[in-house]
Amino acid sequence: MKIRNLDLTRNPINEEHRRLGLPPVEEPVSHPGTHPFLRAAVWFTALVLIALTLFLMGRLFLPNNWAGGLQIIGETLNGSVFWSAVAVGFFAQVVDGALGMAYGVTATTFLLATGASPAVASASVHIAEIFTTGVSGISHTKFGNVNKQLFVRLLVPGILGAALGAVLVTQVDGAMFKPFVSAYLLLLGIYILSKAFRQLRLRTQAPKHVGKLALFGGFVDAAGGGGWGPVVTTTLVSSGNDPRTTIGSVNFAEFFLAFASAAVFALLMETNTWPIIAGLVFGGLFAAPFAAFLCKKLHAKTLLILVGTLICALSLYNLYRALAA
């Protein structure tokens, strides 16, 4: 058995965890700033966001293209596509940041409804997710929602799976994976709902097979346009792990997956959906800090119910769409 530094004090959070049969809060999670690795990950994320913003601004306005850049911005702001994407981006990021899932599913559904191909939809969502998951991940870390050990175990396999999925979806239609993934998620959603209403078994061991789970989750996320949160978060939460720290860790790891898959998409295909990407980013940036705060304040049982209900509803909807196609 792996020895873990648990906070066993009698505080409101641990009392609720005891009633639900969830693990006690871990001391490293309560004090995330003491971990150099998490601090380095936060700084890397912030630097990537700044560098990408400067790069895109340079592509828009340089060299000596201020008039053309302002014209493009004006046309984008006056278009209905941009503001529709803003609304979708805000809603999708609130759901994803607070529950750890469904940003890709929500946003991809919108893009597919506009006529975009699965490859273009997935590319647009993952490029936008670089910004939204970056801000959300930093917020989760600051609120103490990230478990360093779990985050590290998710990182490399998840990145590898996302890169492989991005390569596949540019060659084969990723929609063929949807029926199988949706059926799997529906069963997990039902299982999570049952956990919220019965005594859970206390777990003190680290979750098993996290690397394999992250590899699969990253793959279906890039190939199908969404699924990292539903696959990884629901599996870990349904195994009896703390919803708050699981959501925060999975959400922060998603930034690095989005960065890797977006790089592969940029190399293998061209996309002209920048107004949609800009709208998703703009809406998501406003929602990310609010979602992390919501995750911090909601009770564990409430999170279990919300996660289970959301997964069941989305899985039924996606399964119906996939089978009716």
Regions found by a protein language model. Give the residues of each.
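Hydrophobic alpha-helical transmembrane segments in multi-pass integral membrane proteins
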Residues: 53-57, 164-168, 219-227, 261-264, ...
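Alpha-helical transmembrane segments of integral membrane proteins
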Residues: 40-43, 83, 123, 176-183, ...
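Membrane helix-loop-helix hairpins that form the core translocation module of multi-pass transporters
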Residues: 50, 124-196
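Membrane-interface helix termini and inter-helical loops of multi-pass transporters
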Residues: 60-75, 167-175, 265-274, 322-325
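Intrinsically disordered, low-complexity non-transmembrane regions of multi-pass membrane transporters
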Residues: 1-45, 53-75
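Transmembrane helix exit motif
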Residues: 52-66, 135, 142, 182-205, ...
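Small-residue-rich hydrophobic segments that form or flank transmembrane alpha-helices
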Residues: 3-23, 70-75, 82-158, 210-223, ...
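Selective transmembrane alpha-helices of multi-pass membrane proteins
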Residues: 47-48, 158-163, 174-196, 280-292, ...
